[in-house]
Each structure stands twice: as structure tokens, then as C-alpha cells.
Amino acid sequence: MDTTVIGVDLARYISSLTESENLTVGGFAVGADLIAYAIGGSAKRAAMDTWTDESEAAFDAYVEALVGVIGHADRAEPLKDYCLGLLMPGERKSVEPLAAVTAPSRVAAQHQSLLHFVGQAPWSDEALMGRVRDWVLPRIERRGAIRAWIIDDTGFPKKGKHSVGVARQYCGQLGKQDNCQVAVSLSVANDAASLPIAWRLYLPQVWADDPERRKKAKVPDDLTFQTKPQIALEQIRTAQAQGIAPGVILADAGYGADGGFRAGLTQLDLTYVVGVQPTLSVWRPGEGPLPPKPWSGKGRPTSLMRRSPEHKPISAKALAADLAADAWRTITWREGTNTDLKSRFAAVRLRPASRDFNRSEAHGEEWLLIEWPEDEAAPTKYWLSTLSADSTIPQLVDTAKLRWRIERDYQDLKQELGLGHYEGRGWRGFHHHASLCIAAYGFLISLTETIPPSASFQAQNRQAPGLSQGYRPRGAPDPARAPRPHLNSNTPTTAHSRLGRAARTMSMLHKGHGRSPLSSKFMTQ
């Protein structure tokens, strides 16, 4: 019979398990010896006792720090309960299940309290996330300087049409167009960890231009339509103004293919490594647009660059096909679960040609980084980068591949903390729930970065999800439409990706038997 263990001595509980018994963390069975190893590579009871006490005290201190930015004192208790509920095991992390698990003797009253707190209370999401950032980033930076600011968006499939921002659009979770909500976020990362520091729902044009829908969902009156790259640039400008430690901007082709986004980053004096489409127009190395046509003495002189039938750019795909065999190098960028992560890459210094016929000067030289796995018939990924001209191919690859950190953020936030489980329809509740999920996530990260996990444990046991059937990364060629995969939003699709971290959080563990955390395959990028 399953028994929920809350607030008990973690060490005694683990030591009471037999070899055949499992401890379920986040819905997955973990052997007692594995938990002990995750806690610090040792089963010493004294160390685990101390850690449990410290983690409980750390949670109280963390919540107390957050309370200072949410206004009324009567919001302190629902804040703590909401975060506590998100950290506890459970298939659903919507308001009603959170009420049941945090106040089983008064579920109805707790439900009303949490519902008001997340859906209606006018506290600031930006202030809460700012306090989380100020608490967590110093702990992350103990493991190394911030290397990257990572932009991405994540989708939440929906069946109805009344939830704020829902529309038929690209859904990253499904890898295709579907009915969903999409939020844009900015994470800061080093090699050890990452943290989302900005989050905003993308409001499609059909919503932005519909006063009735906006009113029902209580969309802020001053909010106007912005594209996802425009939202991302706004988040980046805000982070700059807040004095966040700078990093290279990383983004996929959904952002990198937007010339305005790249130009905006350059105007902000930020370097980037961003995905682009194979159709990107580029000049061959050493080439560029023709200078303005000489003035004939009649009419107004022109200052615009030009092309000719004999002098014109080519696509990134065509340039890749023309590269010599010795231009390609096999680069290893990270240690995977079972093998090193490696592929073939080429890097070329060139000028993008994007609409340069409307410019008075050519684009500056950048790196075009191309990935062509040996088992593929053609290159699979392309990036543009403004990293310095003396950067090496391994440096370019290592930086580009750090974007996996934001995918890990989304994976943990969705599968472990219920990021996609909010059932309300309004703007405020959508953002409040996400901010609280990020706050809970920040607490887990702060514990991990305070007591570093075993490197060998991480390398051998951290898992990531397999991709759903029909998944197509944004920017990839469009294959024949695949049937829509069946996704159960109530059940995680993979094992806990940060087992060591979860086991060290608090003594909120569930005794039982479940799927092995080593049963799924590691997703790499």
C-alpha cells in the first residue's frame, strides 16, 4: 500500500527500505541505494540527516524571501502552499490537486485560497521572478560564469478556444501546427545550470485585435501585438537594464531566421549563435553586394547596394553542398548517457545577404556553422554567429549546443512541476502559475548548486525524453504530415531528468513501485 511521506526524517525512511523496495520521486521508482548515492555518493546517515534539515530550512528561507515582493501578508501562506504543492509528487499540479495535497483536512477552503491567489491576486510576476533570479543566480554562478542567454518558446496543446492566447500555431511539444498556447521565455545559463528569468504569453493577432476576447481573458489594455522575436528582444532589453551578467544569445531558427531579431541583437551590442533556415541567402566567402550604381548626373543618386545576374548570393544549403570534403570536422561537444555526443561540422566566414539591396552598406562578416551528421544525406542544422573571427569550430559548436539548457528547463518545468497544468483561462492566472512554477524550479536549482551533485551520477543516470511521433524541429524541412501523436498530459513521458536533485530537495517522497528512471532514452541536440 502506498504511503505518502511528508516531513519525516529522510535518512531513516531511506534506511528502512529493503533492497527490493523502491522510493518513488516525481512518479518514478528509485532504489534506496540510488537515492543515497544521489544525495552525495555516500549512505552516511549523519550526512543525510544534516542535509534534510538544511533543505527544510532552505525552503522556509526561500519562501520568506519571496513573500517580500507579493504585497499583502495574507498571501504568504498560499504562496508557500502553492510552491510546496508543486514540489510534491502528483500527476496533476492544477489548483484542486494542489489544495488536496497541501490541506487534506480542508480542501474546499484551501482550493478557494489558492484559486484566488493564482487567478486573481494582483501581485507582480516580474517582481517575483526578479526575487527568484536574485536568490538563485549567485548560487548558479558558484559553478561558473554565465555563458548564455537563451531564447525559446514552448507550447501547451489545448482543445478549446477560450483560454487566453489559444490559436492554431506552431506547437513545439507536438512539432507541428496545432491548437495551443505559446509562451516566450529567456533563460540564463552556464555549463552547470540554467534559470528562466522572463516569461510571457504570445498573443496571436486574432486575439490582439479582438476586444471582446481580450476583455473576457483580462488581457492588459496596453498590450499590443508583438511577434515572438519582438517579445524576445523586449525580454533581452529588460535583462540588460537589470544588469544581468551578459552571455551569448542563443535561439533556434524561429528567431534566428528573423533579420530584425539579429539586427536588434547587434544594436544591443550582443553576440549571438542563432539557428537559421537552409534557404538563408548568403554571399560566398570573400564576396558581397555590388556598390551603389554610379550617378549618371540625372535624377537623384542612389546609395543602395545592388546585385546583378552574374553577381548574386546563394542559399546556405547550396554553399554547404559546395564545401570541400576537408572542410568538415568531427566535433565532440558533450558526454552523453551512453556515448559522446558528436557530429560533423563546417564553419565559414561570410556575409549574410538578407535584403542587403535595401541597405547602403553590406552586412558584416559572420560565421555560418553547419552540421552534417555522417548518417544523413544532407546537412541538418545551420547557425549564424557573430562570435569573434578567431573563434574555433569547437568553440562555435560548444556554444551553439548549450541551447539544450532551455529545453531542459521546459522539460523539468512541465514534467515535474506542472507548468502546463493550469486550468484557468485568464491572462493573470496563466502568468501567475508559470511564475510560481519557475519559483519552485529555482528552489530546486538553488539546492543543486549549493551541494553539487556527483558528476559520475549525473553522467550515468540523467535522462531526457524521447520525442513524440511526428515531431519536427522548427526550421527543419517539412515532411509529409504525420498523424497527431496521442499525448496524455496527466502522465510524464519520461523519467525524472534530475534525479539527484529531486532526491535532495525535501522529504516529500512517495513509497511505491513504478517505472524505472533508466527506461527512456537520452534526447540530445
Predicted region positions:
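Conserved nucleotidyltransferase catalytic core and NTase-mimicking acidic/glycine-rich helix/loop elements
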Residues: 443-477
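An anionic, glycine-rich sequence signature occurring as long contiguous blocks
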Residues: 192-224, 273, 277, 282-405, ...
